Design a protein with these regions (language model features):
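Surface-exposed patches in mature extracellular/periplasmic domains of secreted proteins
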Residues: 154-155, 264-271, 301-312
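Active-site-adjacent substructure of cysteine-protease-like catalytic cores
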Residues: 309-383
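Solvent-exposed loop/turn segments at secondary-structure junctions
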Residues: 244-247, 256, 277-281, 308-310, ...
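Structured segments of extracytoplasmic/periplasmic soluble domains
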Residues: 142-149, 255-264, 293-297, 315-320, ...
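Active-site-adjacent structural segments surrounding the nucleophilic cysteine of cysteine proteases
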Residues: 18-64, 167-296, 361
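Long, charged/polar, surface-exposed segments that mediate recognition or autoinhibition
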Residues: 21, 70-161, 340-342
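Classical Sec-dependent N-terminal signal peptides that target proteins to the secretory pathway
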Residues: 1-20
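Noncatalytic regulatory segments and standalone regulatory/sensor domains
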Residues: 184-186, 190-230, 348-362, 369-412
Length: 412
């Protein structure tokens, strides 16, 4: 694949322009956190040298990490100085053994605020914001000045994305056959992406998807639908975006559904688009605008309903189109849905059972991706943004219809 889901800087939106950054920094997607140690060596020359881009000879030791695409993603085991500033994380993205991009994260708002809060719990949010802005301004200024010295030219303004809501603007410096792309979003992150100029794109769609006409895309999605002997009809190939401890269920599930459709914007990039300022709250976010924009960037049609409609949903799922549902959540019901994924029969939809459904408006909200159904048993099959163990959960359609309050149907 031409590039991997990225994010950085405002948890950057990506494009083949910003490739190689895994979905969630700090291990939220991949499990255990890997923290490279900081060193004072300068790796700048090594990362832009011909030996790296022609012979695939990268400096230092790199650790392979899982990726959502077919690319190989590696993280550098140290944080050196690059273009005048210490890095926070450095990633390399390779396709079939060929280096495609190097992404350097300098500053991440989530990591910054988490670390400061842990080390100094008495520090108030206003002083933290002032400290972050000061750090942000220093890093941005240093990087741009150093890049100007290297390239001996001013940057060109560029962008990726078709919608005002998710479009990201960058400063591109040209250095031989390479583009050095600075992504700096005040209030979020700062990163630098190094790539071949020939790989620059203005769309978030994967290179493969962008080459297909809609009829071909629909055919590919249809081929992901599998019918099993027990009557289950399921969509295969929807990736897992783990939300970790953040209030990202609506964002992670959107990312899962749209990545499946060919969009290469991860949860963090979408969070930035939804105006998530910091990681501990979804307050003030513009979620409905985000869903509409993500669908448009996916070159897909989004139709929104209120309560889940089982009859309508079947028509979408049979064609390989995913559905995201916002619903009210109950821990007790969740245990039943988990058990059903392991083969335990769901309780019958009796009056006594219905009493336990979380239908109250003050019940916690949650988002799930509907991936299949069984018409014979009247069950829906769904997944959560909690990890691979949260796939193939089951719920009676009546329960989902009663507990849902927004449904998003995607189609090509």
């Amino acid at each position: 694949m031409k590039f991997l889901t990225i994010l950085i800087a405002s948890y950057l939106s990506w494009s083949l322009t910003c490739s190689a950054i895994p979905q969630n920094f700090g291990g939220n997607l991949f499990g255990a956190t890997f923290e490279p140690r900081t060193i004072n060596d300068d790796f700048t020359e090594n990362l832009i040298a011909a030996s790296a881009w022609i012979n695939n000879k990268l400096p230092g030791t790199w650790k392979s990490i899982p990726s959502l695409d077919e690319d190989e993603v590696k993280i550098l085991n140290v944080n050196p100085i690059i273009f005048g500033q210490h890095s926070s994380s450095v990633y390399a993205n390779e396709e079939k053994g060929k280096l495609k991009s190097i992404s350097i994260l300098y500053l991440d708002s989530g990591k910054f605020f988490n670390r400061r809060t842990i080390s100094n719990k008495s520090q108030d949010i206003k002083s933290l914001k002032r400290e972050f802005k000061k750090t942000y301004d220093l890093i941005e200024s240093t990087i741009n000045k150093t890049l100007y010295k290297y390239t001996k030219s001013s940057p060109k303004e560029s962008f990726v994305g078709q919608t005002d809501f998710l479009r990201n603007n960058y400063n591109d410096y040209e250095f031989g056959d390479l583009t050095l792309r600075v992504s700096a979003k005040n209030g979020h992150n700062i990163c630098l992406i190094i790539m071949r100029s020939a790989d620059v794109s203005k769309t978030y769609l994967s290179s493969k998807t962008s080459k297909l006409i809609k009829r071909e895309r629909r055919k590919e999605l249809q081929q992901n639908v599998q019918m099993q002997e027990n009557g289950d009809i399921k969509i295969n190939g929807i990736p897992m975006f783990r939300q970790g401890q953040r209030p990202y269920c609506a964002i992670s599930t959107l990312g899962m559904a749209t990545h499946y459709l060919g969009l290469r914007l991860g949860a963090d990039a979408l969070a930035a688009g939804a105006r998530f300022r910091y990681i501990n709250t979804a307050k003030g976010s513009k979620m409905l605008d985000l869903y509409r924009a993500a669908a448009e960037e996916s070159d897909a049609i989004l139709q929104r309903g209120r309560s889940f409609d089982f009859e309508r949903a079947q028509k979408y799922l049979e064609k390989g189109f995913p559905i995201v549902v916002w619903r009210r959540y109950s821990h007790e019901r969740n245990l039943l849905h988990n058990a059903a994924a392991q083969g335990t029969k769901l309780p019958e939809s009796t009056p006594n059972d219905r009493i336990t459904w979380p239908t109250a408006k003050d019940a916690p909200g949650h988002a799930s991706v509907i991936t299949g159904f069984n018409k014979k048993t009247g069950e829906v099959i769904f997944m959560e943004s909690w990890g691979e163990h949260a796939r193939n959960k089951r719920m009676r359609a009546e329960e989902l219809e009663a507990t849902s309050y927004a449904t998003f149907y995607f189609k090509i």
